[in-house]
Structures are given as structure tokens and as C-alpha cells.
Amino acid sequence: MQDFPTAPAQAALFLDFDGTLVEIAERPDAVVVPPDLPSLLERLSAHLGGALAIVSGRPLLELDHFLPVAIAKAGNHGAVLRPLPDGPVEQPALASPPAAWRAKAGAFAEAFPGAFIEDKAHGFVLHFRQAPEAGPEAGMLLTSLVSEAPDDFALMPAHMAWEVTPRSVSKGTAVAYLMSRSPFAGRVPVFIGDDVTDEAGMAVAREAGGLGLRLQDSFGTPGRFRDWLAVLEGQLARGVAA
Ligand SMILES: O=P(O)(O)OC[C@H]1O[C@H](O[C@H]2O[C@H](CO)[C@@H](O)[C@H](O)[C@H]2O)[C@H](O)[C@@H](O)[C@@H]1O
């Protein structure tokens, strides 16, 4: 078992989705969620008094689609949160990138068969997994566009994708906000993720005395990570992990 900085029963778990809980797929809609994963996460959340949250770049509705269980979720890299499993959705007021940026990115993607844009509420992703030759040029285009409003927007490298996001939110702000309120407050944060976009969440967890774990280093693969979660759930259920 991965060592915790405290008794596991006192931890607050923050889990990335793509590349951590599920394997990366060719397209965002093609990820395969193991049938037993949602209920495993729901049981883990219950053992932790609700202090388990999915913290993802995905929109909240997609997280609800892939993980249709009552657990806390933060989507769009911290731009939308549901801190309590069945509670209300919370969204800070955020600007959207200029329409001209989206139009230029869309025209760029159209020139590379396989590349496409994924729209989000306050940003967009330019995916190039099926057009890898587009990656560097896409990065240069979006770097140039974001430089027009660097205080408001950030460009994040993701797995075979570039994402334009509001600068004021991140997985770090999501973890900090959740840790400020029940049932997360007072627990020791443990963030597990696989990507550059997870580093802000890991950093906040570490600064709070917890753990920021990179999946590849600590677990290897999403499958092995899911196995670890199942073992942890069993221990918490039997009361032998505290
Ligand atoms: O924060 P995450 O839960 O890791 O989500 C990050 C982004 O994941 C998705 O894109 C990535 O996963 C796809 C499915 O495996 C893959 O096809 C793509 O190449 C990856 O970049 C999702 O589409 C984004 O919205 C998330 O921000």
C-alpha cells in the first residue's frame, strides 16, 4: 500500500479522472469505465465521511455520465464544483476566451484531419491525438492567442492536447476550496493524478501537509491504481486502515 502521511481513515482523497482512474483513449468519449469503479468510489467516499472528490478537467456533466454515483466532483479544472455528493453546483463567475480565439483554433483544427476542438464553458481544448503532427504548431498558435490576455487565461499542456482555461482557477484552487469546508476540512489531503494539469492539485495537497502523488511513479498504471483503491476500500470497511 502507498504510505499515507496519516491514518488513511483521516485522509481526504482527490482523484484525477483521465489517465488516473481510467486509461487514456483515442477520443474523450471513448474512455472505458470499469463497471465496478463507480460503486467502489461511492463506498470509499462513505468510509471517508464524504471526503473524496474527483478533480478533473472534464465538465461536471461528463463526470456524472461516466461516474453516476453521489460523490463530490470538481470539473473544468476547478471552474465548477459540487462539494457535497448531492449538493448544489458552485461556479465562480469567469470570463470566456474571445470568440476570435475559438474561431482561429477551429480553423487550425480543420486543416489537420483528426484534430478537433472540445468546447468548455469558459475555454476550449485543441485535441491532436489523431493528428500528432499538429501538436507543435497548435501550441504556438494558442500560446500567441493567450498572450493577448495573459492575466485572464492560461494555456495548459495536456495529453496530446492544449487547453485554454481561465487563469483564476485550477485543480489547486479546487483542492484549496474543498479543504476549507466540511467534510474535507481537518483531514489530510492526498491528491493523485498523472498529468501536468494535476500538478497544481498535488502542490496544494503537499503544502497542506498531505501527499501529491504522480500516478506513474506511485502506482504505474490506472489498473494498478484501481487495485490499490480496492484494497484501501477493503481495509477501511474492516476498520484495519485507521
Ligand atoms: O483532468 P482529467 O480528468 O485528467 O481530464 C483531462 C482532459 O481529459 C480528456 O482528454 C484527455 O483524455 C482523452 C480520453 O482518454 C484523450 O483522448 C485525450 O487525448 C486527452 O487529452 C478530456 O477530453 C479533457 O476535457 C480533459 O480536460
Annotate each PLM feature.
Residues V32-K120:
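Active-site phosphate-binding/coordination module
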Residues A115-P132, F153-T165:
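Charged, glycine-interspersed solvent-exposed loop segments at helix/strand-loop junctions
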Residues N76, P83-K104, M156-G186:
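Substrate-recognition "cap/lid" segment bordering the active-site pocket of phosphatases
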Residues M1-F17, L21-E26, D36, M179-S180, ...:
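Non-catalytic pre-domain segments flanking phosphatase-related domains
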Residues P8, R167, G172-A242:
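Mg2+-dependent phosphoryl-transfer enzymes with acidic/Ser/Thr/Gly-rich catalytic loops
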Residues T20, L60, T197:
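Conserved Rossmann-like nucleotide-cofactor binding loop
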Residues R58-N76, A134-A154:
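Substrate-recognition/cap helix-loop segment adjacent to the acidic, metal-dependent catalytic center
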